[in-house]
Amino acid sequence: MQKIRKGDKVVVLAGKDKGRSGEVLSVQPKDDTALVRGVNMIRRHQKQSQSQEGGIITKEAPIQLSNIALADPKDGKPTRVGFIFQKDGKKVRVAKRSGEVING
């Protein structure tokens, strides 16, 4: 089970976007990276094709998982993630900072 998943709210801990937060668009576990909306933006020169216009576009670049932390559901501050088994035997993610169960 992954600690950070698609749709989670995360906070950037290091790098040029330190302190910014956003939603995880995708996670690449093999590369230990994630795409976060509005974070680590890069500019790329796009060649014109039949389906797309040419020009300079800005898009998100992958960011290392070690440089982001899950935002605590209670106060939005960065937290570590733990796992517990509920009474029905289901394994769930828990915010270590507040003890809150994380959705998903």
Swiss-Prot record:
One of its GO terms (molecular function) is structural constituent of ribosome. Gene3D superfamilies: 2.30.30.30. It comes from the Bacteria. GO terms for biological process: translation. SUPFAM superfamilies: Translation proteins SH3-like domain. Keywords: Ribonucleoprotein, Ribosomal protein, RNA-binding, rRNA-binding. Transmembrane segments: none annotated. NCBIfam families: rplX_bact. One of two assembly initiator proteins, it binds directly to the 5'-end of the 23S rRNA, where it nucleates assembly of the 50S subunit. One of the proteins that surrounds the polypeptide exit tunnel on the outside of the subunit. Part of the 50S ribosomal subunit. Belongs to the universal ribosomal protein uL24 family. This is Large ribosomal subunit protein uL24. It comes from Mesorhizobium japonicum (strain LMG 29417 / CECT 9101 / MAFF 303099). The gene is rplX.
